[in-house]
Every structure is written in C-alpha cells, then in structure tokens.
C-alpha cells in the first residue's frame, strides 16, 4: 500500500503549474486532495480533470491573503475528511523589477502573498498536522537562498520563507511535525500565471533587460519539469527530509556565498 493511501493533503496555488503537478502526484499515490486557488474557474477545471478514475480532488476557491478564506479552506477540509496529513504552501508569485524601482508598497504586496499568506495557512494547519505527525511543505526558491538581479521584492520574500521554515523545523520538529523547505530553480510551464503574466512580460519592468524576463530571471539552467519536482517532493516527505534543492548543484553556490560572497556575486552576475 502507498504511504499516501487515504491521507489528506491541501495544496495552495493548486490550480496550475507546480501546484497542479503536486496535487496530481498526491492523487496518483492514493491521497485525498484539496486544491486551493483564487482563480476559481481554472480551479474547477483542474479538479474535474484530476478527479478521474475514482480519485478525489476537492476544489476550494480561496485567497491566502484573506484570513476568512483561509479559515473557510481548513474548516471545509476538516469537516469533509476529519483530518489533515499534509499542507503544501505553493501559492505565490514572482516579479520583474529593478531593486531601486521596487517601492515599499511593492514589497508589502508581495510579502503579503508569498510570506504572510503562508504564515496564515501554516498556523491553521499546525494543530491538525501535529496530531498526525504530518508534513508541512513550503515552496521557496533558489532565490530564497541566493538573491538574483531584476526580480524586485521576490528574493526578500523567499528568504523570509526559508527562515520561517527553519524556525518551524527547529520548534515543531521535536513534536513530530515534518517540515520540508523546497528551493527549486525555474519551473517549466506552458503559460505564466494570470496574475503574474504582465509582470513577467516586462510591461511593468522598466529598465529590466530582456534576458531577465525569461523563467528564473534568465538564470542559465535547464527548466525543471513540474511533474518530476512533484514526485521528488513526495519522496522527500516520505523520507522526512529537511530540504530539497533542485538542481542539487546549487548547493555549491550557497556554500560559496558563506565563504566568499564577492566571488559568489560574480558567479551570479555571469550566470544570469
């Protein structure tokens, strides 16, 4: 029997891209999945497509920046299934902007989605996950370990996610909660997210070079297939790993940053 058979998982940002791939991996392994997104129409379509062959996928339209939506998401899940075994905090977005063109309001808006929304869902999930020795998965980014150029407030939000995840691991790990930080490079996708597309096309990014408008802000690495990353995330949960960094070679850069920040900066400039 699969490790995930009949377990219950919530995936935020679950209507498309990596979130959809994670939801599909869960259902294929026998889990019952709740997908949440603020894009209600796409969410319903995704749930219908993933609910074939007897699989159970429940769509809940929810915006993680709204506390009432988060409460409704978790109330619906517990009322319907009576338990929660995994939360994947995948909701979030990037941006393209020169750092000095990024206003305090830009930072506040992106922090609200990428960090504060994650804090809201984590707090709502924690009692249920602790009761079941469950899994908390926070999707950060390579930019949550090493900042990049031309991405405005994005690295600051993802560094915050990485730090918050370590705090959770330190405090709640001894109580039985598995906490996984996922730091992927650019993820392949057919279309940019609806709420992110203008930003990534450069319509709101004066002064940003065209190369930085590509996935991963133009970093010279192969885009990751979401299905492969989703499978790796489930395996990392089963092994209760602390971190998943893709590609693994990025760890060398992160180590170099501690030893020689100046050299690491030179490498980042040369590879983006």
Name what the model sees in each region.
Residues 170, 174-248, 266:
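SDR active-site lid
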Residues 141:
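Residue(s) in the substrate-gating loop at a strand-loop-helix junction
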Residues 122, 157:
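Active-site helix of classical SDR
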Residues 100, 146-152:
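Active-site loop immediately N-terminal to the catalytic Tyr-X3-Lys motif
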Residues 8, 13-16:
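Conserved glycine-rich cofactor-binding loop
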Residues 31-45:
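Conserved glycine-rich Rossmann-like NAD(P)H-binding loop of the short-chain dehydrogenase/reductase
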Residues 70, 98-99, 103-108:
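Substrate-binding pocket helix/loop in short-chain dehydrogenase/reductase
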